[in-house]
From Swiss-Prot:
Tissue expression notes: Expressed in the neurons of the larval CNS from the beginning of the first until the third instar. Expression in the third-instar larval CNS is restricted to a discrete number of somas and projections in the brain lobes and in the ventral ganglion. In the ventral nerve cord, expression is detected both in somas and projections. Expressed in the antennal lobes, the optic lobes, the central complex and the median bundle in the adult CNS.
Glycosylation sites (chain numbering): 112, 143, 216, 299, 386, 491, 524
Organism encoding this protein: Drosophila melanogaster (Fruit fly)
Family to which the UniProt record says this protein belongs: Belongs to the G-protein coupled receptor 3 family.
Cysteine pairs bridged by disulfides in the record: none
Residues on Cytoplasmic side: 650-663, 715-738, 805-817, 877-976
Domain of life: Eukaryota
Signal peptide extent: 1-25
Protein name per UniProt: Metabotropic glutamate receptor
Keyword Transmembrane set for record: yes
Keywords in alphabetical order: Cell membrane, G-protein coupled receptor, Glycoprotein, Membrane, Receptor, Signal, Transducer, Transmembrane, Transmembrane helix
Any Pfam family the entry gives: ANF_receptor
GO cellular component: G protein-coupled receptor homodimeric complex; membrane; membrane raft; plasma membrane
C-alpha cells in the first residue's frame, strides 16, 4: 500500500528506529527474546495483530504467565483469517496473511512491537521478514509475511490502543480494536484511523449507573485501574453518577505496579464507609482478582457487593479460589454470542497440530498443568522471561499426555471478546472486498512502465506482482489507508457468524449492547456460574428477582442515609448523600428533596406534601348562625319600622302625627330602615356592589338618623332658651328649614363617603387570619371604616350635649327626654361596639355579627324610644289623638303662670310676653288663665314648638287650642 506521508522528520525517526532494530537483531544478548516470537502467515494482503498473550513482567517486558484470553483472541484471528481465505465470495483469488505480535499487556512494549508494522510499510526497508538465528547476519525468516501491513487488529487494552493508534496514524495504517473501550479513542481529531467493534465506555458507565439506580443504591465506592481504560471509564461513571444523584463514598485507583499492601489499603478504606456496601470496579481483570484476594485476606464480616465492568466480565479463571468472595457479583459484559464453530476449532487443536502459534504450547501447559517434553512443539525461548524451564514448580508438574484435549471439563470456555475479534477481521475483509470490486474489476491491464513503476515504489506490489495467482491489482496497492478507512472500512455493514449486526458509527465505534451477569452458585452443585439477569441496549432491562446476593436473602441497601418519609426533606451532613430528615412546616410543601417552600396565601399542602391546593374561600353564609341572628333582628326591626311608617301614613293628618314634625319623623324612620337593611349588605357575599352598599349604607343610614335628631334637639334647645331672652321670632325653625338643615348634614356624610371611595376604591380582598383560612372581605381597612364614622360620632356627641341641655325643660315635654335617652343608649352601644369590633378581627363572623347587631340596636333604640309613645296613642288610645286634652301638671301650671307674669318658671325657664302672645310649655298649647290673661295669638318664639310635643297646634291659621280650653299633653297621658 502506497503511503502518502511526506513528513521527512517522521520518516527519518522511523528509519533510525528501524536500523537500530536491525542492529539489535545481530546482538547476541537479545537472541531468542520474546521480540523475535510472532505469528506470521504469508498472504497477498497482510493484517497485523496485537494481543496480550503474556502478563506484564517484573524487570522484563513480559511475565511468565500466559493469558487464556490473549491466546483465544489470537486463535480467533487465525480462525477468522482461515474462514475468509476459504470463502470464495470474499476476496476471491486474494489471500490474507497475518503478522501477530504479543503486547505482554504493556503499552510501551506494544508500541515497540508496532514498529515492525511501520518498518514494513517503508518503501525500501522491510526487515520484518528477517531473523538472526545464531547471531550472524539477518536471514529471511522462514514464515515471513514478505509484505507490508495493510491494517492492524488490536490492541486489547485501551492504553495499548492509544499508544499504537498514535503511531499507525502517521503512516495511514487503519486499526480496528476488538476490546479497547476508552472514550477518548472516539476523538477523530486524534485517532482518525482507529475503529472498534465494541462501544466506548461511555455507554458502559451509563449501564453501570442504571444498575445502581435499579437497586436504589445512592452511596457506593469505586475502584479503577491506572491507565486509559480505568481512568476514562471511571471519569464517565462519576459524571453520570453525579448527574443522577449517586454519591461516591470512596474512589480509589490501582497503580500499575501495585503490591498486596496497596490492595489491602484499598479494602481498609472501603471498610471505613460501612454504609457504602456497593463497590463498582472499573479495572482490568488482573486488578479485579487482586482486589478480591485482598478482600478475602481482610476476612470481612459484612461482604461487599461488587458491580464490575467488562474488565471482569464473565471470566471464570479470574475467580478461581475466590468464589465465596465474588458470589453475588453483578458484572457487565459486551453482548456476544458463542460461535459454536470456533469451539470446535479450539477443541481440535493440540501443540502438534498448531505449530503456527508459538505460544500455544505454553497455553497448553498452563491449561493442563503439565509439561511438554517434545522440543518440536515448544518455542525456542530459553532465555525469555516466560521460558517454561524458568517456571516455578516445573518439577512438580506431570508430563502432558497425548490424549489431552480442550473441553469444558478442563475449564475451557469461549472468551467473551472472541466474537469481536472475528468481527474485526471480517470488517477488514469486507472493506477490502469492496475496494477490490471498485478498483480492480473494471480496470484495464497495466502498462509495462506502470508495472515497473509500482514495483519500484511499492513493496506490497513487488510481492503480489510475483504471484501470478493473486487477483489483487496495483490500484489496491496504491490506495491510501486513510481513504480506505473513511470510504470503505467505516461503511461496512454485515451480519456476523453469531447472527449479530456489525457496523460502525462516524466515530468508528461499534453498537452498544451489554449483558448483565450475576455470579451465582449452581443449583445442586458446589460450582459457580455467571447467569444472565438482564440486558442493556439504549436502556436497562433487568430481572431483579433472579439476582442472588452474597449472604443476603433480600436486596441489600447501599445508602449513607435512609430515604426520608413523604413530606420530609434532607438536610445534608458531611457527604452529599448523607443527611438527616426534617419535616416541612404545616403550610409548606416539598419543593425538592432538600427544600421546603411556602404554599403561599390561600393555599395548603396535600397530605403527602408534594403539592398544594386552593383553600375554600370563606365568607358569611346565609344559613350560618352568625348570619341568622342579626338577620332575624333586622327583619324584626324592618317589620316594626314598616308598621310605624304605615301607622304614620294612615294618620298622616291627625294632630299627633302633625305635632311630631312629619318631615323629620319620616326622615328619621327612613334612616332607621336603612340601618336595618345594612345587615343584609354586610352578610351578603362580598362583591363590588355589596361593598359599595356597605360603605353608603352604614355611614349614610346613621347620618340620616342623627342629623334628624340633631335638628330636633337643636330646635328645642333654641326655642326654650330663646323664649326667656327674646320675644323675636326664631329663624330656621319651620319644617322646610328643618328639612334643609337635615339634608345638608346628611350631604356632608355622603361627600365624606364619596371621598373615601375615591381614596380607597371599593372592591374585595382576601384576608388571612391564619394560614388555613381565606376570608373574602370588602376592601375596607378597619381604621378607614372608623374614620368614615367619625362624622356620625360628632353628630351623636352634639345630640347628646343638646339632650343634656334640654333635660330640665317642663316635665310634660317628654320627647326631649326620650331623645336624651336615645343618645345615652347609643353612646353606650358605640362605646361597647368599638372594642368588640377591633378585638374580634381574627373572627370575621363574630366581627360582622357584632357590627350588624350594633347597627340594628342603634336603630332599634331610636325606633322604640322616639316612636313607641306615639304608636301607643295611635293604636291603643286613638281617642286621645285630639286637640282638647287636659293639662293637669302642677309644674306646667306654675310654668304657664310664671311665663304669663313674666317671672321665671320653676323649671328654670322664664318668659316675658309681648302684647298679643300666649305662653306654651311642655309642648302643649293652653293655660288655666282666663282669656283676658292669654291672648289668642301665639308667641312667635313658640310657633311650631308643639311639633315636638304630642299635642297638635297650628300657627298662622293652623290648629290651635281655644283660649281657656283645658288641654293635657299626650306624653303626660302616656306617662300616667
Amino acid at each position: 500500500m502506497k503511503q502518502k506521508n511526506n513528513n521527512g522528520t517522521i520518516l527519518v525517526v522511523v528509519m533510525v528506529l528501524s536500523w537500530s532494530r536491525v542492529v539489535d537483531l545481530k546482538s547476541p544478548s537479545n537472541t531468542h527474546t520474546q521480540d523475535s516470537v510472532s505469528v506470521s502467515l504469508p498472504g497477498d494482503i497482510i493484517l497485523g495483530g496485537l494481543f496480550p498473550v503474556h502478563e506484564k513482567g517484573e524487570g522484563a517486558p513480559c511475565g511468565p504467565k500466559v493469558y487464556n484470553r490473549g491466546v483465544q483472541r489470537l486463535e480467533a484471528m487465525l480462525y477468522a483469517i482461515d474462514r475468509v481465505n476459504n470463502d470464495p465470495n470474499i476476496l476471491p483469488g486474494i489471500t490474507i496473511g497475518v503478522h501477530i505480535l504479543d503486547t505482554c499487556s504493556r503499552d510501551t512494549y506494544a508500541l515497540n512491537q508496532s514498529l515492525q508494522f511501520v518498518r514494513a510499510s517503508l518503501n525500501n526497508l522491510d526487515t520484518s521478514g528477517y531473523e538472526c538465528a545464531d547471531g550472524s547476519s539477518p536471514q529471511l525468516r522462514k514464515n515471513a509475511s514478505s509484505g507490508p501491513v495493510f491494517g492492524v487488529i488490536g490492541g486489547s487494552y485501551s492504553s495499548v490502543s492509544l499508544q499504537v493508534a498514535n503511531l499507525l496514524r502517521l503512516f495511514h495504517i487503519p486499526q480496528v480494536s476488538p476490546a479497547s473501550t476508552a472514550k477518548t479513542l472516539s476523538d477523530k481529531t486524534r485517532f482518525d484511523l482507529f475503529a472498534r467493534t465494541v462501544p466506548p465506555d461511555t455507554f458502559q458507565s451509563v449501564a453501570l449507573v442504571d444498575i445502581l439506580k435499579n437497586f436504589n443504591w445512592s452511596y457506593v465506592s469505586t475502584i479503577h485501574s491506572e491507565g486509559s481504560y480505568g481512568e476514562y471509564g471511571i471519569e464517565a461513571l462519576h459524571k453520570e453518577a453525579t448527574e443522577r444523584n449517586v454519591c461516591i463514598a470512596v474512589a480509589e485507583k490501582v497503580p500499575s505496579a501495585a503490591d498486596d499492601k496497596v490492595f489491602d489499603s484499598i479494602i481498609s478504606k472501603l471498610q471505613k464507609k460501612p454504609n457504602a456496601r456497593g463497590v463498582v470496579l472499573f479495572t482490568r481483570a488482573e486488578d479485579a482478582r487482586r482486589i478480591l484476594q485482598a478482600a478475602k485476606r481482610a476476612n470481612l464480616s459484612q461482604p461487599f457487593h461488587w458491580i464490575a465492568s467488562d474488565g471482569w466480565g464473565k471470566q471464570q479463571k479470574l475467580l478461581e479460589g475466590l468464589e465465596d468472595i465474588a458470589e453475588g457479583a453483578i458484572t457487565v459484559e459486551l453482548q456476544s454470542e458463542i460461535i459454536a464453530d470456533f469451539d470446535r476449532y479450539m477443541m481440535q487443536l493440540t501443540p502438534e497440530t498448531n505449530q503456527r502459534n508459538p505460544w500455544f504450547a505454553e497455553y497448553w501447559e498452563d491449561t493442563f498443568n503439565c509439561v511438554l517434553t517434545s522440543l518440536s512443539v515448544k518455542p525456542d525461548t530459553s532465555n525469555s522471561a516466560n521460558s517454561t524451564d524458568n517456571k516455578i514448580g516445573v518439577k512438580a508438574k506431570t508430563e502432558c499426555d497425548d490424549s489431552y484435549r480442550l473441553s469444558e471439563k478442563v475449564g475451557y470456555e469461549q472468551e467473551s471478546k472472541t466474537q469481536f475479534v472475528v468481527d474485526a477481521v471480517y470488517a477488514f475483509a469486507y472493506a477490502l472486498h469492496n475496494l477490490h470490486n471498485d478498483r480492480c474489476n473494471t480496470q484495464s491491464d497495466q502498462t509495462t512502465e506502470t508495472r515497473k513503476h509500482l514495483q519500484s515504489e511499492s513493496v506490497w506490489y513487488r510481492k503480489i506482482s510475483t504471484d501470478t495467482k493473486s487477483q489483487a491489482c496495483p490500484d489496491m496497492a496504491n490506495y491510501d489507508g486513510k481513504e480506505f478507512y473513511n470510504n470503505y472500512l467505516l461503511n461496512v455493514s454485515f451480519i456476523d457468524l453469531a447472527g449479530s449486526e456489525v457496523k460502525f458509527d462516524r466515530q468508528g465505534d461499534g453498537l452498544a449492547r451489554y449483558d448483565i451477569l450475576n455470579y451465582q452458585r449452581q443449583e445442586n452443585s458446589s460450582g459457580y456460574q455467571y447467569k444472565v439477569i438482564g440486558k442493556w441496549f439504549n436502556g436497562l432491562q433487568l430481572n431483579s428477582e433472579t439476582v442472588v446476593w452474597n449472604k443476603e436473602t433480600e436486596q441489600p441497601t447501599s445508602a449513607c442515609s435512609l430515604p426520608c418519609e413523604v413530606g420530609m426533606i434532607k438536610k445534608q451532613q458531611g457527604d452529599t448523600c448523607c443527611w438527616i430528615c426534617d419535616s416541612c412546616e404545616s403550610f409548606e410543601y416539598v419543593y425538592d428533596e432538600f427544600t421546603c417552600k411556602d404554599c403561599g396565601p390561600g393555599l395548603w399542602p396535600y397530605a403527602d406534601k408534594l403539592s398544594c391546593y386552593a383553600l375554600d374561600i370563606q365568607y358569611m353564609k346565609w344559613n350560618s348562625l352568625f348570619a341568622l341572628i342579626p338577620m332575624a333582628i333586622a327583619i324584626f326591626g324592618i317589620a316594626l319600622t314598616s308598621i310605624v311608617i304605615v301607622l304614620f301614613a294612615k294618620n298622616h293628618d291627625t294632630p299627633l302625627v302633625r305635632a311630631s314634625g312629619r318631615e323629620l319623623s319620616y326622615t328619621l324612620l327612613f334612616g332607621i330602615l336603612v340601618c336595618y337593611c345594612n345587615t343584609f349588605a354586610l352578610i351578603a357575599k362580598p362583591t363590588i356592589g355589596s361593598c359599595v352598599l356597605q360603605r353608603f349604607g352604614i355611614g349614610v343610614g346613621f347620618s340620616i338618623i342623627y342629623s334628624a335628631l340633631l335638628t330636633k334637639t337643636n330646635r328645642i334647645s333654641r326655642i326654650f332658651h330663646s323664649a326667656s331672652k327674646s320675644a323675636q321670632r326664631l329663624k330656621y325653625i319651620s319644617p322646610q328649614s328643618q328639612v334643609v338643615i337635615t339634608t345638608s348634614l346628611i350631604a356632608i356624610q355622603v361627600l365624606i363617603t364619596m371621598i373615601w371611595m375615591v381614596v380607597e376604591p371599593p372592591g374585595t380582598r382576601f384576608y388571612y387570619p391564619d394560614r388555613r383560612e381565606v376570608i373574602l372581605k370588602c376592601k375596607i381597612q378597619d381604621m378607614s371604616f372608623l374614620f368614615s364614622q367619625l362624622y356620625n360620632m360628632i353628630l351623636i356627641t352634639i345630640c347628646t350635649i343638646y339632650a343634656i341641655k334640654t333635660r330640665k325643660i317642663p316635665e310634660n315635654f317628654n320627647e326631649s327626654k326620650f331623645i336624651g335617652f336615645t343618645m345615652y343608649t347609643t353612646c353606650i352601644i358605640w362605646l361597647a361596639f368599638v372594642p368588640i369590633y377591633f378585638g374580634t378581627g381574627n373572627s370575621y363572623e363574630v366581627q360582622t355579627t357584632t357590627l350588624c347587631i350594633s347597627i340594628s340596636l342603634s336603630a332599634s333604640v331610636a325606633l322604640v324610644c322616639l316612636y313607641s309613645p306615639k304608636v301607643y296613642i295611635l293604636v291603643f288610645h286613638p281617642d286621645k289623638n285630639v286637640r282638647k286634652l287636659t293639662m293637669n301638671s302642677t309644674v306646667y301650671r306654675r310654668s304657664a303662670a310664671a311665663v304669663a307674669q313674666g317671672a321665671p318658671t320653676s323649671s328654670g325657664y322664664s318668659r316675658t310676653h309681648a302684647p298679643g302672645t300666649s305662653a306654651l310649655t311642655g309642648g302643649a298649647v293652653g293655660t288655666n288663665a282666663s282669656s283676658s290673661t292669654l291672648p289668642t295669638q301665639n308667641s312667635p318664639h313658640l310657633d311650631e314648638a308643639s311639633a315636638q310635643t304630642n299635642v297638635a297646634h297650628k300657627t298662622n291659621g293652623e290648629f290651635l287650642p281655644e283660649v281657656g280650653e283645658r288641654v293635657e299633653p299626650i306624653c303626660h297621658i302616656v306617662n300616667k
